[in-house]
């Protein structure tokens, strides 16, 4: 079984990094491609949401994983991203024979065969499917967390460092789910961040 993995939320200031792992047969690959499956960044939110049930129904296997803000702060974004990918892979019902990893960096924590593919989310349907599942899952979490932390507007920017988010950080300070290691680079100590 070949599995594609991808992550979302790597550059956010808030919340976990998400990853998904997806295995597709050749027929499922063709069907999803015909439905417009491509890199999640090239799709509208509605189109991504519409594709999710098709991906879940047609995939041989799929799973999600997360790397928490605490893990990002403790170990760095690369390790936390690898942990999210590893967790997704470990949730699959069958051990993959080959893992296709989006990007240039190999998954150091994975003991099996793997291949990195630059812009893999626009070249391999399994990676594109993983990018869509991870993006929709993370965006859903951000909308739920927006109800808990309404002053930050997470439903609008998903935790990325927009002007709205940076202003909310200055006004309200960070939450326990903010990535402190990212904030120290963005806000020098004398910048008024609580």
Curated annotation (Swiss-Prot):
Keywords: Cytoplasm, Endonuclease, Hydrolase, Manganese, Metal-binding, Nuclease. GO terms for molecular function: manganese ion binding; RNA binding; RNA-DNA hybrid ribonuclease activity. SUPFAM superfamilies: Ribonuclease H-like (SSF53098). Its cofactor is Mn(2+); Mg(2+). A divalent metal cation binds at residues 6-7, 102. It holds the Pfam family RNase_HII. It is an enzyme of class 3 (hydrolase). It is found in: Cytoplasm. It catalyses: Endonucleolytic cleavage to 5'-phosphomonoester. Its EC number is 3.1.26.4. GO terms for biological process: DNA replication, removal of RNA primer; mismatch repair. Its main location: cytoplasm. Residues 1-194 form the RNase H type-2 domain. Manganese or magnesium. Binds 1 divalent metal ion per monomer in the absence of substrate. May bind a second metal ion after substrate binding. CDD domains: RNase_HII_bacteria_HII_like. GO terms for cellular component: cytoplasm; ribonuclease H2 complex. Coiled coil: none annotated. Endonuclease that specifically degrades the RNA of RNA-DNA hybrids. Belongs to the RNase HII family. NCBIfam families: PRK00015.1-3 (NF000595), PRK13925.1 (NF010537). This is Ribonuclease HII. It comes from Synechococcus sp. (strain WH7803). The lineage of its organism: Bacteria, Bacillati, Cyanobacteriota, Cyanophyceae, Synechococcales.
